[in-house]
A protein has these predicted regions:
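Flexible, small-/acidic-enriched active-site or ligand-binding loops
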Residues: 227-275
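Acidic glycine-/aspartate-rich tracts in secreted/extracellular proteins
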Residues: 112-114, 192, 236-238, 292
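A short acidic-Thr-Gly-centered motif at the start of a beta-strand
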Residues: 79-93, 256-275, 353-357
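Aspartic protease catalytic domain
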Residues: 2-6, 10-36, 43, 93, ...
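N-terminal accessory segments
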Residues: 2-96, 104-106, 208, 384-386
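Short hydrophobic beta-strand that contains or immediately precedes a catalytic carboxylate
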Residues: 88-90, 95-102, 106-108, 185-186, ...
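Extracytoplasmic, non-cytosolic globular domains
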Residues: 275-317
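Signature of the N-terminal lobe/flap region of pepsin-like aspartyl proteases
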Residues: 68-174, 179-181, 311, 321, ...
């Protein structure tokens, strides 16, 4: 067994309690954005992910045709769009997956994906090494912001921590146009947006009685090599301050809710005022309508660079910037400038606020997750939020 496999196995099976299952998360080695093109790729990715065109209203959960699952539209994540991922076994073979509350499908690279193995250096699935593998044979193609992936559907045992899901459907990718720092994606949104039409893994856990409670939660960490954890089947009150504030899901597709407002109270800037928002662990930034994002950026003195399309601030100014405030379910939640500002190049930083023309909702990404404990309740269709320790 190669060293990488050993490390993943130790991580996957050494982090468990009787009440819930803790999955150790890894964090991308750096928060510095290496090139402006990654932001543009991010914008395209999010547009595809939520089915948005520049001139059209959004269709939550992406786009597909009635003839799917042979064709569907869903994202593929690159290394700089999301920073947190964790271990998983498929057919007893180790992979790193991005756990995404903004999608519902599970896919990993197949052995015949030469780009995945040689160019991207991802782990690939070898069907001959799994005794529980069952080929489905149904072809699928997934279109995302900067390319597409395609392959076939299959079924196998999927293990996350000490949870082993039998007969889990997933996609085996044989062609891809881009690389990521993790091998695949495991979606945690509702089954209604599962574009491969396979039951999402967490719903399989519930059906097979593998978790005590139909809830999962995120505790992500910043400025540390320990990325935090994904907790399946429960929550851990020792990881947050006070009690959870709950907000109801307004649509059982994505984790969509009503946000009271977002802004900088100290600078008399308040946007949104009762709007739709999506809690998305698969997006690293805070994304919103162009007018609102422009106002947020201007209130902190950010300058728009027309050459690279970025809102820039001098890194030395971070300590003088205001705290961002989000009003949710009548409570106030805050994000410090150290979290919403991202290093770009020498002495120049960019803001974590990205606009997307054509949307009338907000996407709350990892900028918010890093400061808060997030609980997702499948049974009661609600999100719990508390300040993380």
């Amino acid at each position: 067994m190669n060293p990488r496999a050993v490390i993943l196995l130790l991580c996957a099976f050494g982090c468990v309690s009787d009440a819930f299952h803790r999955i150790a998360m890894q964090r991308h080695r750096q928060r510095k954005l290496p090139h402006a093109r990654h932001l543009w790729a991010s914008r395209k990715h999010i547009r595809r992910k939520f089915g948005v065109t520049a001139a059209a209203a959004p269709q939550s959960g992406g786009s597909s045709t009635n003839s799917a699952p042979s064709e569907a539209i869903e994202p593929l994540f690159n290394a700089y769009e999301t920073q947190f991922y964790g271990p998983c076994l498929v057919g007893n073979q180790p992979f790193t997956l991005q756990f995404d509350t903004g999608s519902s499908d599970l896919w990993i690279p197949n052995a015949n994906c030469t780009t995945c193995a040689k160019t991207c250096d991802n782990s690939v699935f070898q069907a001959a090494k799994s005794k529980s593998f069952v080929a489905n044979g149904t072809a699928f193609k997934i279109t995302y912001g900067i390319g597409e992936v395609s392959g076939v559907l299959a079924t196998d045992t999927v293990s996350i921590g000490q949870i082993s899901i039998k007969n889990q459907g997933f996609g085996l990718v044989s062609q891809t146009d881009t690389c990521s720092s993790f091998d695949g994606v495991l979606g945690l949104a509702y089954p209604a947006v599962a574009l491969t039409r396979q039951k999402p893994p967490f719903y399989q856990m519930i059906e097979q009685k593998l978790v005590d409670q139909p809830i999962f939660s995120f505790h992500l960490k910043s400025n540390t090599t320990d990325g935090g954890s994904l907790i399946l089947g429960g929550s851990n009150s020792s990881l947050y301050h006070g009690s959870l504030t709950h907000v109801n899901v307004t649509e059982q597709k994505l984790w969509k809710f009503t946000m009271d407002y977002i802004g900088f109270p100290s600078r008399k800037c308040r946007r949104c005022n009762g709007c739709n928002a999506i809690m998305d662990s698969g997006t690293s930034l805070l994304v919103g309508p162009t007018e609102d994002i422009t106002q947020l950026n201007r209130k902190i003195g950010a300058k728009y660079n027309t050459t690279n399309g970025l809102w820039e601030v001098q890194c030395a100014r971070i300590k003088y910037l205001p705290v961002l405030e989000l009003g949710i379910a009548g409570k106030k939640f805050h994000v410090r400038p150290q979290e919403y500002i991202i290093a770009y190049e020498d002495n120049v930083c960019i803001t974590g606020f990205m606009d997307l023309a054509g949307i009338n909702f907000w996407i709350i990404g990892d900028v918010f997750f890093r400061e808060h404990y997030l609980l997702f309740d499948v049974e009661q269709n609600r999100i719990g939020i508390a300040v993380a320790k």
